[in-house]
Amino acid sequence: MQHNSLIARFARGNLVIQILVGIILGISLALVSPSSAESVGMLGSLFVGALKAIAPILVFILVAASIANQKKNQHTHMRPIIVMYLAGTFFAALTAVVLSFMFPTTLTLVTGAEGANPPQGIMEVIKTLLFKLVDNPVNALMSANYIGILAWGVGLGLALHHASDTTKAVFEDLSHSVSHIVRFIIRLAPFGIFGLVASTFATTGFDALAGYAHLLVVLLSAMAIIALIVNPAMVYVKTKQNPYPLVFQCLRESGVTAFFTRSSAANIPVNMALCEKLKLDEDTYSVSIPLGATINMAGAAITITTLTLAAVHTMGIEVDLMTALLLSVVAAVSACGASGVAGGSLLLIPLACGLFGISNDIAMQVVAVGFIIGVIQDSAETALNSSTDVVFTAAVCESEAQKAKG
C-alpha cells in the first residue's frame, strides 16, 4: 500500500521541480562517484530512446487524425506560424552577426573532423530535403524522417477526409492512445535527466570547454537575446499581450528537457503535451510542432553564423556589411535545411565558410571546435529551437482567437 501511495505522489508531483531535483542529484553523483555516474547514464539513454521511439508514430497519427477530422471552413493558421519560424531564424542569424562583430572571436584550430562529410552546396541540402519528402512511409517512420512523416501524414489525412465517420473515429482514438503513452514517458523525465546529467558531467567534465570560453559566451549570449528579447518582441507584435509568462513557461517546460536530451525530435512529444496543457488548437499544433522541429532553427542559424565568423576573424579576412547580411540569409536558409544533413548545424559551417573563400580543411577544423563545445552548444541550440516552436505556435493561436472574438 505504501509502495502504491509513493508512486501516486510521484505521478501527482510538479514535473519541473522533480526534473530540477534530478539535475542536482545527477551533478552530485558525478562529483562524488564518476564511475557510478557513467553507469546511471543508461537511464538517460533509455529515456531519450523512448521519446525518439514514440515521436515518429505520434507525429504521423496526430497529423493524419487532425486533418481527417478537420471540419469544413476550419483553419489551421499554418501560414503565420511558418512566417514567424522563418523570420525568427533570420533574426537569430542577424543577431549572431552583430555580436560576432562586436566581440570578434579567434580560434585555436584543431583537427579531428576529417571523417565528416559536409554538403557541397545549398543545392545539395535542398536536394536531400526533397528526397526526404518522397521517402517510403515505413522507412520515414523507421529513420525518424519528419519531413517524410509530415508529407505522408498530411496525404493520408486528406485522403481520409472523405472516409466514413467510423474510420475517422479510429484515427482519433489512436491519437488519444498514443498521447497517453507520451504522457507516461514524460512522467519519467526526472529519472532520464538524472542519468543524462550524471553521465555528461562524469564523461566530459568542463576543462575541455575552458579554452573556448569566449566563443561559448558569444554563442550563448546570442541565444539568450533571441530567447529573452527577440522572441518576446515577436510574440508581443502578434498578440499585443505581455509575452513573458508564455516565454518562461515554454523555456521551463520545453527548453529544460530539450537542453538535456539534445534532440528536437525527442522533444516533439514534450512540446505536444505542453501545447495540450496550454489548450491550443490541436489541428494547428499537431502540424506546427513537428514542422518546427524541421525548419524552425534559430539556434542552428546562430551556431553556423558565429562559428563561420570566428573562422573569418581567425584567418584575418575583412568582411563588409553586405557580405555579413548575405551570410545571415545563407545561415538562415541552411539552418532550415539542417534536418537534411547528418550532423546538423555543424556540418553546414563549411557551406557558409565557402562565402569567404575559406578552404574546406580550415572549415572542417572549425567543425571540430564545434564538436568540442557541443556539450553546451548543442544543448542550448536544441533548447532554443524546441521551446521557440511552442512560443510561436501559441502566439499565432492566441492572435487568431482574439480575431475570432472580434
From Swiss-Prot:
Segments passing through the bilayer: 15-35, 47-67, 81-101, 140-160, 191-211, 215-235, 289-309, 315-335, 362-382
Keyword annotations of the record: Amino-acid transport, Cell inner membrane, Cell membrane, Membrane, Symport, Transmembrane, Transmembrane helix, Transport
UniProt-listed InterPro entries: Na-dicarboxylate_symporter, Na:dicarbo_symporter_sf, Ser_Thr_transp_SstT
Key word Cell membrane present: yes
Coiled coil feature spans: none
Membrane topology type: Multi-pass membrane protein
Record-level GO cellular component terms: plasma membrane
Presence of keyword Membrane: yes
Subcellular location: Cell inner membrane
Listed Pfam families: SDF (PF00375)
Signal peptide start-end: none
Catalysed reactions, as listed in the record: L-serine(in) + Na(+)(in) = L-serine(out) + Na(+)(out); L-threonine(in) + Na(+)(in) = L-threonine(out) + Na(+)(out)
Listed GO biological process terms: serine transport; threonine transport
GO molecular function: neutral L-amino acid:sodium symporter activity
Domain of life: Bacteria
Function as written in the Swiss-Prot or TrEMBL entry: Involved in the import of serine and threonine into the cell, with the concomitant import of sodium (symport system).
Similarity annotation: Belongs to the dicarboxylate/amino acid:cation symporter (DAACS) (TC 2.A.23) family.
Record protein name field: Serine/threonine transporter SstT
Organism encoding this protein: Vibrio vulnificus (strain YJ016)
